[in-house]
From Swiss-Prot:
This is Coronin-6. The keyword ATP-binding does not apply. Residues 407-433 are annotated as: Disordered. InterPro entries: Coronin, DUF1899, WD40/YVTN_repeat-like_dom_sf, WD40_repeat_CS, WD40_repeat_dom_sf, WD40_rpt. One of its GO terms (biological process) is cell migration. Residues 430-464 form a coiled coil. WD repeats lie at residues 23-64, 72-111, 122-161, 165-204, 210-251, 256-296. It comes from Homo sapiens (Human).
Length: 472
């Protein structure tokens, strides 16, 4: 299996290791909803997990440092009236997360740096435009406040979250349920997979399918696809005999795959997590207890098997940390957050190196939190690659930044071509007032808690004095 190429790779010795028990997150009731999303999203500040909740949908957000047992009364993010199906952190604001639900809505939330005293129930904005459940979310990689959603109505909507407007609605390109959507590196193209077995490349601003492959995989199970750094596509699917496959495609020649890897026979859909800095793709299947990883190169045979991380427990979902959230001092090149039935376990991928110096070859400049474009610039046809940062001195997440939703002058906005959207939550120049009220409530609750603790301390001191007096 191309042993010569793998042997020369700097990633040939990459190994995975589960974090110690005290670094896991325990007693989390992970959602049991049947849906092929990762159920987990992570960034350098927070870990978010879709959880079981009565009376609607919810997810929990934990600071990364809050490991160990999670209190059963820990505040949740609630507001959806049906199960949450997907969550995605904004790449340009580590305190903003979007959630999609079976209730047909998308909600965008501001997460405070401090631990809230009660459930977070008020989103910054609610986006309504789909007629059926919304199961896929993806933020634009370079444009500020641009969010994509895909629903069971076979429609893709691209929103400007900063104004609540529909920028684009792609409603006639998929005849059946959409299984996955992925942006390319500069957000000029989309790759989609659909229940009709077709892999499509779409120019969303032109509203055109620019290339397609009718049956990239012969099997009946769902497909997934992601762009590589050089514009090729990686797809996962099934053979006619139900063997799981990984294929590499050149969009300029969609007739045959550039490379095809066949693996085991299993029902679990393979979720591909691609790292453009190392050109490694990690394959995680729901129900699997392993993570396979391959290096993608521009020399035959193009897809090189590296190794498999195996554990005893099957995974219910998986989160993938952005490169800026890794520990470069330990030569960590990837970190996953594996969901079990009632816990989340970090899994660290490391390249063994003897030197303690910064490893330039492992850590090229990587996308940072600053957007390269505004939403209007992207919509007008501009493209820009991500704004890169160096990890040489490590990465420190910026302080809390509030997402402001502004309502435009109706006379300055052309009627949207896509579905209409709810104004209920976006009529929020009141957001500042709401933030102030929330902070005042938090301060009041903290004062009450301090007062109660002071009373408890006084009572304990009195009891101690009585015990001391009784022994004298």
């Amino acid at each position: 299996m191309s042993r010569r190429v793998v042997r020369q790779s700097k990633f040939r010795h990459v190994f995975g290791q589960a974090a110690k028990a005290d670094q896991a997150y325990e007693d989390i009731r992970v959602s049991k909803v049947t849906w092929d999303s990762s159920f987990c999203a992570v960034n350098p500040k927070f870990l978010a997990i879709i959880v079981e909740a009565g009376g609607g949908g919810a997810f929990i957000v934990l600071p990364l440092a809050k490991t160990g047992r999670v209190d059963k009364n820990y505040p949740l993010v609630t507001g959806h009236t049906a199960p949450v199906l997907d969550i995605d952190w904004c790449p340009h604001n580590d305190n903003v997360i979007a959630s999609a639900s079976d209730d047909t809505t998308i909600m965008v939330w501001q997460i405070p740096d401090y631990t809230p005293m009660r459930n977070i129930t008020e989103p910054i904005i609610t986006l309504e435009g789909h007629s059926k459940r919304v199961g896929i979310l993806s933020w634009h990689p370079t444009a500020r406040n641009v969010l994509l959603s895909a629903g069971g109505d076979n429609v893709i909507i691209i929103w400007n979250v900063g104004t609540g407007e529909v920028l684009l609605s792609l409603d006639d390109m998929h005849p059946d349920v959409i299984h996955s959507v992925c942006w390319n590196s500069n957000g000029s193209l989309l790759a989609t997979t659909c229940k009709d077995k077709t892999l499509r490349i779409i120019d969303p601003r032109k509203g055109q399918v620019v290339a397609e492959q009718a049956r990239p995989h012969e099997g009946a199970r769902p497909l997934r696809a992601v762009f590589t750094a050089d514009g090729k596509l990686l797809s996962t699917g099934f053979s006619r005999m139900s063997e799981r496959q990984l294929a590499l495609w050149d969009p300029n020649n969609f007739e045959e795959p550039v490379a095809l890897q066949e693996m085991d026979t299993s029902n679990g859909v393979l979720l591909p997590f691609y790292d453009p800095d190392s050109s490694i793709v990690y394959l995680c299947g729901k129900g699997d207890s392993s993570i396979r990883y391959f290096e993608i190169t521009d020399e035959p045979p193009f897809v090189h098997y590296l190794n498999t991380f195996s554990s005893k427990e099957p995974q219910r979902g998986m989160g993938f940390m952005p490169k800026r959230g890794l520990d470069v001092s330990k030569c960590e090149i990837a970190r996953f957050y594996k969901l079990h039935e009632r816990k989340c376990e970090p899994i660290i991928m490391t390249v063994p190196r003897k030197s303690d110096l910064f490893q330039d070859d492992l850590y090229p400049d990587t996308p940072g939190p600053e957007p390269a474009l505004e939403a209007d610039e992207w919509l007008s046809g501009q493209d820009a690659e991500p704004v890169l940062i160096s990890l040489r001195d490590g990465y420190v997440p910026p302080k809390h930044r509030e997402l402001r939703v502004t309502k435009r002058n109706i006379l300055d906005v052309r009627p949207p071509s896509g579905p209409r959207r709810s104004q209920s939550a976006s009529d929020a120049p009141l957001s500042q007032q709401h933030t102030l009220e929330t902070l005042l409530e938090e301060i009041k609750a903290l004062r009450e808690r301090v007062q109660a603790q002071e009373q408890r301390i006084t009572a304990l001191e009195n009891m101690l004095c009585e015990l001391v007096d009784g022994t004298d």
